[in-house]
Regions:
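Membrane-embedded beta-barrel scaffold of Gram-negative outer-membrane proteins
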Residues: 296, 300-314, 440-451, 477-533, ...
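Conserved C-terminal beta-signal and adjacent last beta-strands/turns
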Residues: 219, 234-235, 389, 448, ...
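Signature of Gram-negative outer-membrane beta-barrel scaffolds
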Residues: 344-441, 456, 565
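N-terminal periplasmic "start-of-domain" segments of outer-membrane beta-barrel proteins
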Residues: 38-71, 96-101, 116
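A beta-strand signature from Gram-negative outer-membrane beta-barrel systems
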Residues: 127, 136-180
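Transmembrane beta-barrel wall of Gram-negative outer-membrane proteins
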Residues: 183-212, 217-255, 279-298, 328, ...
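Periplasmic plug
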Residues: 99-149
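Gram-negative outer-membrane beta-barrel transporters
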Residues: 337, 394-399, 407, 498-507, ...
Length: 680
C-alpha cells in the first residue's frame, strides 16, 4: 500500500472541521442510545439469543434512515462492507451475483453463494442442497442485517458455515411511502417505489424496483426487475401471522473474466469467447412464505412454510444450461426464553427439484445448439431435528449446548440414455454439536464457543462430472468444519465507544474445491484439509450526536494443511485476502448527511498453487445528501455519490482456479451517481 493511499485511508477517521461539529445537532439525533448494546433478538439463530448475550460472534447492523435514503445501495457489497469477517466480491454485472465468504467459508463459489445460510425476511434463500441465489434481494430496501460468523449447522444444517439474515422491514412496522430515482456513470439507472401502512388488521410493506446498466465492461449490459413485501397481523392475543413475498426477473450479459495481461491492458474488455455466443443469463424467481407464532405462556411455538420457483436460461461458451427449479420446506420450533433454563426444539424438512437440460453448444445469437448433452431430473430431500439449551448458572454466567441431526438425499434421474442410464443417488448425514459459554462483565460480554458445520456438494456441483455426462459425481463428498472462538463485546459509556473482537480457528476436513476445465466448466473435488485462523475487531465512536467514526479489521491466515497434491501443502487458500481494513466517518448537521468510507485490501492469491495474485487496492467512496426538504406535503431527499474516488484499477471479484489464468473480474474506474427520494 503506497504512502498516499495509507494517508487517505487514515483521514477517514479524522473528525471533520471543528466548526461543523460545534453547530447544533439535528433534533432527531439520540446521543445516549448510540453506545448501548441493544437487546435485539437474533433471528439468524432462530430467536435463541440476543446480540448482547450470544456466546458466539454475531453482528446486528440496523441501517439508519439516512443510509437507506442517501446511499446508492445498488449492490449487497454496499450493505455488507461495514461488517467484519465477511468478504464480498462485486462483479459489477448481474449475471453471477455477489461472491460471499464468511471466515473463508464459501470461497470456492464462482456463482451463487455456498457455505453460508442466507435468509430474507425470515424465509430461507439457501436451498436444501446448500446453495443460495440472492437475485430477489433488493439492497435499497434492506433495513437490518444479522451476520453470525461462527459455524451454525446446529441451527440450520447444510451449508451453515455462517448465517446472513436480511430484513426489508421489522415486524409490526412499515416505512414511509417514497419514490426514488437514481442515475449514474456507465448507463446506470434505478427506480424504486416503496410504501406501507395499515390495511384493516394488516401491517403491510411493499416495494417494486427496476435497475439497468450499460456497464463499465463490454458485454455487461443488463436489466432487472424486483418486487416484494411483507404483511403481518394478529390472529388473537397470543398468535401472530407474517407473510412474505419476493420476486425477480433479469436479462443480462456476462463479460466473463480476464487474464492478468488483459486486465492490465484494458480492464473494460470482455472475454471474446463469451461475446461470440452472447453469453449471459435470463432468469426469474418467485418465492412465498408464511410464519405463524403462538405464545404459550413462557414458551413460543413457531411454524414456517415456504416455496420457491426459479427458471434459468444460461448461454455460455461451452454449453447452454436451462433448468426449472421448484423448492420448498417447513420448519417447526418450540422455544422457551424465560427462567434459568431456556432453549428450544425444532424439526425441518426441505425439498428441491431441478429439471435440468444442458445443450453442448450455444449459437452466436445466444440460443441453444441442436445437441443435448445432459437431460436429468435432480431431486434433493432434507430432513433434520435439533435441540438447543441455555443454562443461566448465575446472574452473569450462562452455558449453552446444542445438537442437530441431518440426512440429505440427492437423486438424479437420467433421461438421456443413449450412452447408458447414468441415474444415481448420493446420501449424506451429519451430527452437528455446539457448546458455549458467556459471562456478563457489566459493561460487556465475554464468550467462547465450539461449533460445527457440514456442507454437501450442491446439486449443480454433483452434476458437473469430469468429462460431462449424466448422473452425479461419485467422488466428491461433504466438507466438515470444526470451529473454536473466543471474544468480547460491549460498550464504554463514558467514551461513547462500542467494541467487538473475536479470535477463531476453523478446521476444515474434505474441503470442496473448484477448478475450471479447458472449456470453462466448473468441476469439483475434495482438496483435503484447511485451517482458518483469524481475528475480527470492530470499534464505533459516537463522538457527538452528529459525528460517528467506525473502524473494522479482519485478519486471517487460511492454510492448506493436507492435499492429494503435496505441492499445495502450506499454501494459502486462494480468493480471500489476509487482511481487510474498513473505516468510515459519518457527519450529520443542519439537515445534511455525509459519509466518507474506505477499504484497504492487500494482494491475495487466486489459485491453489499460489502462482497468481489479485492486486492490492484502497477503495474510497463518498456520499452527500440532505435528510429532507419539505415542499407542499412532500419531502425531498437528494443525494450524490462518488465511488472509487482514487480511481484505482482493481479486481472487484476473482474466479478461483480459472483455466488459462482468467482469474480477474475488473471493477469500474471512478464513477458518479445522483438520486432523489420523494417521501410522503
Amino acid at each position: 500500500m503506497t504512502l498516499l493511499r495509507a494517508c487517505v485511508l487514515c483521514t477517514l477517521v479524522l473528525p471533520f472541521p471543528l466548526s461543523t461539529l460545534a453547530q447544533a445537532p439535528d433534533s432527531t439525533d439520540t446521543y445516549g442510545e448510540q453506545v448501548q448494546l441493544p437487546e435485539i433478538t437474533v433471528e439468524a439463530v432462530r430467536s435463541a439469543e440476543t446480540e448482547a448475550t450470544a456466546p458466539f460472534a454475531v453482528t446486528v447492523r440496523t441501517r439508519s434512515p439516512e443510509e437507506i435514503s442517501l446511499t446508492s445501495s445498488t449492490s449487497l457489497d454496499d450493505v455488507l462492507r461495514p461488517l467484519p469477517g465477511i468478504w464480498v466480491n462485486d462483479r459489477h454485472h448481474f449475471a453471477l451475483g455477489e461472491r460471499i465468504s464468511v471466515r473463508g467459508v464459501g470461497y470456492r463459489s464462482n456463482f451463487g453463494v455456498r457455505g453460508v445460510q442466507v435468509l430474507y425476511d425470515g424465509i430461507p434463500l439457501t436451498l436444501p442442497d446448500g446453495q443460495a441465489f440472492l437475485d430477489v434481494v433488493d439492497p435499497a430496501v434492506v433495513r437490518q442485517v444479522e451476520l453470525v460468523r461462527s459455524p451454525a449447522s446446529v441451527f440450520w444444517g447444510n451449508g451453515s458455515g455462517g448465517v446472513l439474515f436480511l430484513s426489508s422491514s421489522r415486524p409490526g412496522t412499515a416505512p414511509s411511502n417514497r419514490v426514488r430515482v437514481q442515475s449514474g456513470s456507465y448507463g446506470q439507472w434505478q427506480g424504486l417505489l416503496e410504501g406501507g401502512g395499515s390495511v384493516g388488521p394488516w401491517t403491510v410493506h411493499g416495494y417494486a424496483s427496476g435497475q439497468r446498466q450499460d456497464g463499465y465492461r463490454a458485454h455487461s449490459q443488463g436489466y432487472r426487475l424486483r418486487a416484494g413485501g411483507t404483511a403481518s397481523r394478529s390472529l388473537g392475543p397470543d398468535t401472530h401471522l407474517r407473510v412474505m413475498l419476493a420476486a425477480d426477473q433479469q436479462d443480462t450479459e456476462n463479460p466473463s473474466s480476464l487474464t492478468r495481461e488483459q486486465f492490465e491492458s484494458d480492464p473494460s474488455q470482455a472475454r471474446p469467447a463469451f461475446v461470440n455466443v452472447n453469453a449471459g443469463k435470463q432468469s426469474s424467481q418467485v418465492q412465498l412464505g408464511a410464519t405463524l407464532d403462538h405464545d404459550l405462556g413462557g414458551a413460543t411455538l413457531s411454524g414456517t412454510a415456504y416455496a420457491l420457483r426459479r427458471v434459468l436460461d444460461n448461454p455460455l461458451n461451452f454449453a447452454f444450461i436451462r433448468y426449472t427449479r421448484w423448492s420448498g420446506g417447513t420448519r417447526l420450533t418450540l422455544r422457551r426464553s424465560q427462567g434459568r433454563v431456556q432453549g428450544g426444539l425444532g424439526i425441518d424438512a426441505g425439498l428441491q427439484s431441478d429439471d435440468r437440460t444442458e445443450f453442448t453448444s450455444t449459437t452466436p445469437r445466444g440460443t441453444p445448439g441442436d445437441e443435448i448433452g445432459l437431460n436429468q431430473l435432480e431431486t434433493v430431500l432434507n430432513g433434520s431435528a435439533f435441540g438447543y439449551v441455555r443454562f443461566n448458572a448465575t446472574d452473569r454466567l450462562s452455558l449453552t449446548g446444542g445438537l442437530r441431526i441431518d440426512r440429505i438425499r440427492f437423486e438424479a434421474e437420467d433421461r438421456l440414455t443413449r450412452d447408458g442410464d447414468q441415474s444415481g443417488t448420493r446420501t449424506f448425514s451429519a451430527v452437528s454439536p455446539s457448546v458455549g459459554l458467556s459471562f456478563d462483565t457489566g459493561s460487556g460480554q465475554l464468550f467462547a464457543q465450539y461449533s460445527t458445520a457440514f456442507e454437501t456438494p450442491t446439486a449443480s456441483e454433483l452434476s458437473n462430472r469430469p468429462g460431462g455426462g449424466g448422473g452425479f459425481n461419485q467422488e466428491v463428498d461433504p466438507q466438515r468444519t470444526r470451529g473454536f472462538e473466543i471474544g468480547v463485546r460491549g460498550t464504554v459509556a463514558e467514551a461513547r465507544l462500542q467494541y467487538d473482537a473475536s479470535l477463531y480457528r476453523l478446521e476444515v476436513d474434505d474441503l470442496i474445491s473448484a477448478y475450471e476445465d479447458a472449456e470453462g466448466r466448473e468441476v469439483y473435488d475434495n482438496l483435503a484439509a484447511n485451517t482458518h485462523d483469524g481475528i475480527e475487531a470492530s470499534l464505533t465512536w459516537q463522538a457527538t450526536p452528529g459525528l460517528e467514526v467506525a473502524a473494522r479489521y479482519t485478519g486471517s491466515r487460511f492454510v492448506i494443511e493436507e492435499a492429494s497434491d503435496s505441492s499445495l501443502v502450506g499454501n494459502r487458500v486462494p480468493g480471500i485476502p489476509s487482511r481487510r481494513v474498513y473505516l468510515h466517518t459519518e457527519v450529520s448537521n443542519d439537515g445534511w448527511w455525509g459519509r466518507l468510507s474506505g477499504q484497504g485490501v492487500p494482494s491475495y492469491y487466486t489459485n491453489d498453487a499460489n502462482t497468481a495474485e489479485a492486486p492490492r487496492y484502497v477503495l474510497v467512496n463518498l456520499t452527500l445528501g440532505h435528510k429532507g426538504i419539505d415542499t407542499r406535503g412532500l419531502t425531498l431527499k437528494p443525494f450524490v455519490a462518488v465511488n472509487n474516488v482514487l480511481d484505482e484499477r482493481y479486481a472487484g471479484s476473482v474466479v478461483v482456479n480459472a483455466f488459462g489464468g482468467r482469474y480477474y473480474e475488473p471493477a469500474p474506474e471512478r464513477s458518479f451517481s445522483a438520486g432523489l427520494n420523494v417521501v410522503w
